[in-house]
Design a protein with these regions (language model features):
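Short, well-structured N-terminal submotif of metal-dependent ribonuclease cores
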Residues: 1-38, 49-62
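Short active-site oxyanion
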Residues: 2-3, 32-36, 67-69, 107-112
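Histidine- and aromatic-rich ligand-binding microenvironments
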Residues: 7-8, 38-39, 95-96, 117
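A generic structural signal for short hydrophobic patches within well-formed alpha-helices
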Residues: 12-13, 43, 78, 120-121
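A general structural signal for well-ordered alpha-helical segments in protein cores
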Residues: 22, 43, 61, 78-81
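Short hydrophobic interaction/assembly module
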Residues: 54-77
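Active-site neighborhoods of divalent-metal-dependent phosphate/nucleic-acid chemistry enzymes
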Residues: 70-116
Length: 121
């Protein structure tokens, strides 16, 4: 059975810097029976962090797009993510809009969110 994952920005950053948490992402990426998705908003988040830290933006971008299927956002996904964001903010004041996009993509693809972010615990 194929397992499906959406990797959020937190997990991608951990993977890119090679932490123990990032090793879990690496283990998923090495498996053959997985489908891995990344929201286009997450790509922007990770690329922004790389740029701010003086890292090779093209290399970071290539790693994300080579290792996952990037899901572009449209008006319907944006509407769902907006409603989800509003709902989640009722109980978690620092739940980010990018997190809402990742969770929306996970729900649409019936995937598990791969993250270290406490919002998803």
């Amino acid at each position: 059975m194929t397992r499906k994952y959406v990797i959020d920005a937190y997990a991608w950053v951990e993977y890119l810097i090679g932490t123990q948490a990032g090793a879990k992402v690496a283990a998923v990426l090495e498996k053959e029976d997985v489908e891995v998705y990344t929201c286009a908003v997450t790509v922007a988040e990770v690329v922004s962090k790389a740029a701010r830290e003086g890292q090779d933006v093209d290399l970071v971008y290539d790693i994300l797009v080579r290792n996952s299927q990037v899901v572009n956002v449209d008006e319907e996904i944006s509407k769902e993510a907006g409603v989800l964001h509003a709902e989640m903010r009722k109980t978690s004041k620092d739940f980010g809009l990018a997190d809402a996009y990742a969770l929306t993509i996970a729900r649409r693809t019936k995937s598990k969110v791969l993250t270290g972010d406490l919002h998803f615990k």
